[in-house]
Amino acid sequence: SAIKKIKNKIDTVFMISPLTDNKRIKKIAKSTTGFIYAVSRLGVTGARSNLEKSTLILIKRIRKFTNKPTCVGFGISKPEHVKSIIKAGADGVIVGSAIVDLIAENINNEEKMLNYIYAYIKSMKVATISHKNLSI
């Protein structure tokens, strides 16, 4: 059936927060079939100016138990955040609110909005690869 085909192609993605204990990290690492979503901080999502040190500690804790892909989200909004996160051992970042803000700020000018979004995403992508000395 179509539903069975879809079910077989959807990976599980579990979240790990700074408060998740090591026993649970091991269980999540074993159970996830997609990637691990590392929550950078407690509270709600939204762009933040600073990256908390606990985020980098969390990435290193996760890496003690698994090499499964790990992406960090919640408050990631600057290329400097991305560089630190990748350097700490994560595979990627999840950015939402910062892009939503660009849309909201430029809602009446689609071309400008798309140009800003493109430039922003490019700056974030460059930050993921500049740490590894790769090129786009």
Where in this protein do the model-derived segments appear?
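Glycine-enriched alpha-helix->loop->beta-strand junction motifs that scaffold or abut catalytic
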Residues: 6-13, 30-36, 87-92
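Catalytic cores of alpha/beta
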Residues: 20-30, 66, 72, 76-93
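C-terminal helical cap(s) of enzyme catalytic domains, especially alpha/beta-barrels
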Residues: 86, 98-134
